[in-house]
Design a protein with these regions (language model features):
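Active-site-adjacent structural elements in folded domains
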Residues: 137-143, 193-194, 256-257, 380-386
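Conserved catalytic-core segments centered on acid/base and nucleophilic motifs
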Residues: 272-275, 315, 401
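Charge-rich, low-complexity segments
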Residues: 330-391, 507-525
Length: 525
């Protein structure tokens, strides 16, 4: 089945990069103009460079310095507002062409009333984007903070750059060079004053803020339009040809759901996106919304990246500081899963130790602590209607394995713990013949931990041979095999076969497998 050939996204992002470079030139021009004025003020007060420069020593130019700061705020705000509005429009113009191409391929009426929603430019979302606050700061507040940094940077730069008899013109050029080359300023300041400077790279911060705001406006407009395009199944996030070095961008390429909000993996991200579109048959299908080709979850490599301990540690720290990246802040389910996984790691060792202490009293063993992976957690959230991440009670889990006569005693000990929250009995009738005990513990950071309690025989029946041997040991596994004369792990096999069947279409097959599963588990109870 063919698909529409859409306008070239890669080329569009290359054009965006060129325009962004133009905006950066304008930011540097703003700083050059301000540096000229600052140099003239320094010349007017006769600063001789015998000690470090401070504007506080020259109250006669206090008003002019405040005007300089206000000028920085106003000119940067004008540039960013103008740039975001222009790129919102550019993005929409390109998406108009995408809609035209798609509708033409699908042989639909491009200007028909039915397809008007494809062409909404979402101006209300642009206004919301411009007025938004992040960590309590709107754009004006961020720029005013930068103007304070600029004033402090000027003091350090003037102290470093000044030479006896230097003209305002020469000083302004040196100020611009230093503010555009932060490492040189730091090195020269250290050499001149014998100490490190603790100020921030203000010009770079302004460049980054402008570039990110304008780039995010383009991406946000694009994604708003894609929500209106019901012919889009998802989209690919791809590396730019200009990608400078290996980083998170390499790890997270792939196909994403179209409701995954992407404004870049990091500041100045060069990745670009390409929509995945329907074939003509899919588009005119009565069940278009449920296309089997619809992307419903992030790619496998995304989950693997989140699962890594070092990344979860970074996510946990960023969440605590309120500095999560946009791709987490903007995607609630993904953020909630990632933060929960990070919190689960905090108490894994303590839960394992607690379970082992109880198991030893009854000559039992404990499975190694297991953390629920991102893909499994995200799939669970998406598959159950109205489920919240707080409903997930097994983000961290293990199993205590003891003989049947000790089960009640172990459960009682777990129920006596101060963190005990809930007990659940897994009955054969509800779980295809499998039976067990689940204890949930509520940890101080709010997560729910799960400790299961079961017998060696039930583990033999439920787990694959490889897993069961690892948990029980070869001697116990072989003893149960000899005693029962039954193959181990069929419970897991039946479960996996049932899990992938359709409840409505495969009722008969599900009933057959359920009967087999119940009969099998009955031998191990």
């Amino acid at each position: 089945m063919g698909k529409p050939r859409l306008p070239n996204q890669k080329k569009a992002y290359k054009e965006l990069s060129k325009r962004l470079a133009g905006y950066m030139v304008r930011v540097r021009n703003i700083y050059d103009r301000l540096n000229e004025k600052a140099a003239m003020l320094v010349e007017s007060v006769g600063y001789d460079g015998l000690k470090e420069f401070s504007f506080d020593d020259y109250p006669e130019i206090e008003r002019e310095i405040k005007l300089l700061q206000s000028q920085l705020v106003e000119e940067m705000r004008t540039l960013i507002y103008s740039g975001t509005s222009s790129e919102w429009k550019n993005s929409n113009t390109f998406q108009d062409a995408v809609a035209d191409k798609a509708l033409k391929y699908y042989r639909a009426q491009i200007h028909g009333e039915k397809f008007k929603h494809y062409y909404r430019d979402n101006g209300d979302q642009l206004n919301a984007f411009l007025q938004r606050k992040e960590n309590g700061l709107n754009l004006s507040s961020k720029l005013w903070n930068q103007s304070i940094n600029y004033k402090e940077s000027l003091e350090t730069t003037i102290s470093t750059a000044i030479e006896k008899g230097m003209s305002a013109t020469a000083l302004s050029k040196k100020l611009s060079r230093y503010l555009n080359d932060w490492p040189s300023l730091q090195a020269d300041y250290q050499e001149k004053y014998g100490k490190a400077t603790n100020i921030h790279d203000c010009e770079y911060r302004s460049l980054r803020l402008a570039r990110n705001e304008i780039s995010m406006a383009y991406r946000s407009a694009e994604q708003a339009r894609w929500q209106q395009f019901d012919f889009i199944l998802g989209y690919k996030i791809k590396l730019s040809d200009s990608h400078p070095r290996y980083d998170i961008c390499d790890d997270l390429t792939g196909d994403y759901p179209k409701d995954f909000k992407f404004r870049g993996w990091h500041p100045n991200c060069l990745c670009y996106t390409v929509p995945i579109v329907m074939s003509e048959d899919e588009y005119w299908s009565d069940n278009r919304e449920n296309s089997p080709n619809k992307i419903t979850a992030p790619p496998k490599n995304f989950g693997e990246w989140v699962d890594k301990s070092e990344n979860l540690e970074r996510i946990g720290k960023a969440n605590g500081k309120g500095t999560l990246p946009y791709w987490l802040r903007d995607n609630a389910k993904i953020k909630d899963c990632s933060v929960l996984m990070s919190k689960a790691r905090t108490y894994g060792d303590a839960i394992q130790k607690q379970a082992e202490t109880i198991a030893r009293k009854y000559d039992g063993v404990v499975t190694p602590i297991n953390y629920k992976g991102f893909s499994s957690m995200y799939r669970k959230l998406n598959s159950e209607k109205n489920m919240l991440v707080s409903d997930i009670k097994d983000s961290v889990r293990n199993t205590i394995i003891v003989e049947k006569e000790n089960i009640k005693s172990v459960v009682k000990e777990l129920q006596s713990l101060p963190t005990f929250d809930r007990y659940k009995s897994q009955t054969p009738e509800k779980f295809c013949g499998y039976s067990g005990n689940i204890i949930n513990l509520k940890m101080p950071n709010g997560i729910q931990a799960e400790i299961q309690v079961n017998t060696p025989k039930m583990i033999y029946a439920k787990e694959t041979e490889e897993n069961a041997r690892r948990i029980l040991g070869d001697n116990v596994w072989e003893q149960i095999a000899k005693e029962t004369g039954l193959q181990g792990g069929l419970g897991h096999k039946y479960y996996e076969e049932i899990r992938i069947l359709d409840e409505k279409k495969d009722k008969t097959k599900i009933a057959e497998l359920t009967k087999l599963s119940k009969s099998y588990y009955a031998h191990f109870r």
